[in-house]
Amino acid sequence: MAGLLKKIFESGKKDVKYLERKADEIIALADETAALSDDALREKTVEFKERVQKGETLDDLLVEAFAVAREGAKRALGLYPFKVQLMGGIVLHEGNIAEMKTGEGKTLTATLPVYLNALSGEGVHVVTVNEYLAHRDAEEMGVLYNFLGLSVGLNLNALSSTEKREAYACDITYSTNNELGFDYLRDNMVVYKEEMVQRPLAFAVIDEVDSILVDEARTPLIISGEAEKSTILYVRANTFVRTLTEEEDYTVDIKTKSVQLTEDGMTKGENYFDVENLFDLENTVILHHIAQALKANYTMSLDVDYVVQDDEVLIVDQFTGRIMKGRRFSEGLHQALEAKEGVTIQNESKTMATITFQNYFRMYKKLAGMTGTAKTEEEEFRDIYNMRVIEIPTNKVIIRDDRPDLIYTTIEAKFNAVVEDIAERHAKGQPVLVGTVAIETSELISSKLKRKGIKHDVLNAKQHEREADIIKHAGERGAVVIATNMAGRGTDIKLGEGTIEAGGLAVIGTERHESRRIDNQLRGRSGRQGDPGVTQFYLSMEDELMRRFGSDNMKSMMERFGMAEDAIQSKMVSRAVESAQRRVEGNNFDSRKQVLQYDDVLRQQREVIYKQRYEVINAENSLREIIEQMIQRTVNFIVSSNASSHEPEEAWNLQGIIDYVDANLLPEGTITLEDLQNRTSEDIQNLILDKIKAAYDEKETLLPPEEFNEFEKVVLLRVVDTKWVDHIDAMDHLRDGIHLRAYGQIDPLREYQSEGFEMFEAMVSSIDEDVARYIMKAEIRQNLEREQVAKGEAINPAEGKPEAKRQPIRKDQHIGRNDPCPCGSGKKYKNCHGKEA
């Protein structure tokens, strides 16, 4: 252990030496840079950009660029970065975490690597915890960037897509972590590439990096959509399919557990739901509900595939016969079963897109962060983000007095002592900041101070504008501020007149937080830049942390010594507290690591889907190649399921293939039983694919190429988005329920990974099938736009068109039942002159 500590300490010393050497090189250019005029200094930015274009790396430019940014800060802001700030800037440029104590000027430090990395033209994101800080920093530091000829954008929640796009197009963009994550998710839901707002993620500097990448790491960002408006469609579809007759209206393929409507069944469906063509894109929702109702009623059996318990449909594992708690069938099949069995149909709001901060920020090419407290989480930053934590020395020696903890037997005794301490310090004009872990603690202390007539402010992290204002004045003579869990991070407490003589800022902690880092943050508010200050934590044996980690012996020991109301200062207790904190931190790290392992399953799937969507949206030419692969996989599956080359021909179900092709891919009768007999499985596939290719060729002639390309995009995006949202929903249910299945030797994570993979593969097959069906069977409507598809609605193209001129009927044409009637009425042939025929 000692050897390990020695190694770490020595590597830290090496880091500092290297940074000092580099900072000295920058300082050596100070006079030369100071001699440049404002215009010449600004011209340096243009020169640097050109050099990057010609192949110089940002590392090559670091010393010169930092010197220019440093001189720029002196002229534009009246601030001249110290040597330690240059060192911090180098750490950030290298994609690591600079641990800089409070008041050491982190905001100014960040301007150096931000300026350097903005020269690449790829955009730099500066990330803060709230919009107030993003706004403040963009405004204040923007003066420097603009002075040096760079553009600065501020990305806020209230902006329109156009305004956001402009903010992201700037060299430097200030934003909150939430807004960046949500914009990424929204970008992957758009249907036109012009609607995307973000550029590829290049470099981000995160302020208060521990808060965002550790404390909020487990928080998922979720965009949820309305669940199906009502469950009535499930009930209607269920009622409809129960009126159908097997063979006449539908066929069942036992092997693949699939059900197909026949032509008669389709006509009945169109009449029942009062639509012209079930395969129109505007009727996808109806067709989907019918398909699931057919499956629920005619391929799934109660007490075999599922059971009903307590008004709920529960899935039965086909291999073990166990009930799979928490698992729901996806794509509305579960709701179809609920409608079939007459139990309550559950419809939650749907998660349309989701990502955690861990996975969002790991997508940047380079990530850096700064904070006053990161050393305690060093292992986590290294393991999960591949970032090192490097301590930057302070500009001036810290002279703050950090006193040992005072420990009381009861909470009541502790709070009385806290209030007495505040009153004494207040009386001599010393400013006091009181840190609490919970809101109720701050209210309790506040009421005690009111009774003593001590004027004070209470801060809960709700109103950022007012918060910053209170924190600004917290260092004035006699000020008392009670803050919950370090509200007001990011705003410095500067000492007012006469407070140095009173001892500087006193920070009082009312209990230890479960994380040492949060305690250190509170301590760090005092003694900034060599100011005097004092910090004191008050503990009691009844505190949450002490209760959780067995302090009964200590409590009885204190009572034995008759110290029920008095405090003790004990190194032993302080050590016990610290080891309890270490244990909690370890547990929290493990839990965050586990969340990441679960989230990684969805991350890999999300990357596949988002990449596919991006390719579709960006495609300039026909997507036929992609679609034909989907059709091929679908035909391959249907043929091999019904006519496997590993089975004797007498076991083949050729009629099953014909039923599927008739219902989903080609006009009825295109392929007959005679066509398929006496062929190999491979020949059957090729025959069907040839017929589909000919039908596709014919379909392409119906529209100009750009419009047909648009039709293909509409179908692909509609199907992929619908299936993906259903899949996320199903994965949510799986994850919620997987721990309920931890029987025997089963590892829930392994189970989640393998089932999640199976579900993803099933979704991909389902996408293939639906795309094949809609491409081959949907009628092409000329003004069906992607935007309408994204909202799940499509305008009836017959509305608002000039009335078509009626044409004479020619008997010699072959007219399909779903083709437009040649008389020009705008109706389908089967609903017009087809009736008479």
Swiss-Prot record:
<keyword id="KW-0067">ATP-binding</keyword>
<dbReference type="Pfam" id="PF21090">
    <property type="entry name" value="P-loop_SecA"/>
</dbReference>
<feature type="compositionally biased region" description="Basic and acidic residues">
    <location>
        <begin position="800"/>
        <end position="817"/>
    </location>
</feature>
<dbReference type="InterPro" id="IPR004027">
    <property type="entry name" value="SEC_C_motif"/>
</dbReference>
<keyword id="KW-0479">Metal-binding</keyword>
<comment type="function">
    <text>Part of the Sec protein translocase complex. Interacts with the SecYEG preprotein conducting channel. Has a central role in coupling the hydrolysis of ATP to the transfer of proteins into and across the cell membrane, serving as an ATP-driven molecular motor driving the stepwise translocation of polypeptide chains across the membrane.</text>
</comment>
<dbReference type="InterPro" id="IPR001650">
    <property type="entry name" value="Helicase_C-like"/>
</dbReference>
<dbReference type="Pfam" id="PF01043">
    <property type="entry name" value="SecA_PP_bind"/>
</dbReference>
<keyword id="KW-0963">Cytoplasm</keyword>
<dbReference type="GO" id="GO:0005886">
    <property type="term" value="C:plasma membrane"/>
</dbReference>
<dbReference type="GO" id="GO:0046872">
    <property type="term" value="F:metal ion binding"/>
</dbReference>
<feature type="binding site">
    <location>
        <position position="492"/>
    </location>
    <ligand>
        <name>ATP</name>
    </ligand>
</feature>
<dbReference type="InterPro" id="IPR036670">
    <property type="entry name" value="SecA_X-link_sf"/>
</dbReference>
<dbReference type="Pfam" id="PF02810">
    <property type="entry name" value="SEC-C"/>
</dbReference>
<dbReference type="InterPro" id="IPR014018">
    <property type="entry name" value="SecA_motor_DEAD"/>
</dbReference>
<dbReference type="GO" id="GO:0065002">
    <property type="term" value="P:intracellular protein transmembrane transport"/>
</dbReference>
<dbReference type="InterPro" id="IPR000185">
    <property type="entry name" value="SecA"/>
</dbReference>
<dbReference type="GO" id="GO:0017038">
    <property type="term" value="P:protein import"/>
</dbReference>
<dbReference type="GO" id="GO:0008564">
    <property type="term" value="F:protein-exporting ATPase activity"/>
</dbReference>
<feature type="binding site">
    <location>
        <position position="821"/>
    </location>
    <ligand>
        <name>Zn(2+)</name>
    </ligand>
</feature>
<dbReference type="InterPro" id="IPR036266">
    <property type="entry name" value="SecA_Wing/Scaffold_sf"/>
</dbReference>
<dbReference type="Pfam" id="PF07517">
    <property type="entry name" value="SecA_DEAD"/>
</dbReference>
<keyword id="KW-1003">Cell membrane</keyword>
<feature type="region of interest" description="Disordered">
    <location>
        <begin position="791"/>
        <end position="837"/>
    </location>
</feature>
<comment type="similarity">
    <text>Belongs to the SecA family.</text>
</comment>
<dbReference type="GO" id="GO:0005524">
    <property type="term" value="F:ATP binding"/>
</dbReference>
<feature type="binding site">
    <location>
        <position position="832"/>
    </location>
    <ligand>
        <name>Zn(2+)</name>
    </ligand>
</feature>
<dbReference type="InterPro" id="IPR027417">
    <property type="entry name" value="P-loop_NTPase"/>
</dbReference>
<dbReference type="InterPro" id="IPR011115">
    <property type="entry name" value="SecA_DEAD"/>
</dbReference>
<dbReference type="InterPro" id="IPR014001">
    <property type="entry name" value="Helicase_ATP-bd"/>
</dbReference>
<feature type="binding site">
    <location>
        <position position="833"/>
    </location>
    <ligand>
        <name>Zn(2+)</name>
    </ligand>
</feature>
<dbReference type="InterPro" id="IPR011130">
    <property type="entry name" value="SecA_preprotein_X-link_dom"/>
</dbReference>
<dbReference type="InterPro" id="IPR044722">
    <property type="entry name" value="SecA_SF2_C"/>
</dbReference>
<dbReference type="InterPro" id="IPR020937">
    <property type="entry name" value="SecA_CS"/>
</dbReference>
<feature type="compositionally biased region" description="Basic residues">
    <location>
        <begin position="827"/>
        <end position="837"/>
    </location>
</feature>
<feature type="binding site">
    <location>
        <begin position="103"/>
        <end position="107"/>
    </location>
    <ligand>
        <name>ATP</name>
    </ligand>
</feature>
<dbReference type="GO" id="GO:0005737">
    <property type="term" value="C:cytoplasm"/>
</dbReference>
<keyword id="KW-0472">Membrane</keyword>
<dbReference type="GO" id="GO:0043952">
    <property type="term" value="P:protein transport by the Sec complex"/>
</dbReference>
<keyword id="KW-0862">Zinc</keyword>
<dbReference type="GO" id="GO:0006605">
    <property type="term" value="P:protein targeting"/>
</dbReference>
<keyword id="KW-0653">Protein transport</keyword>
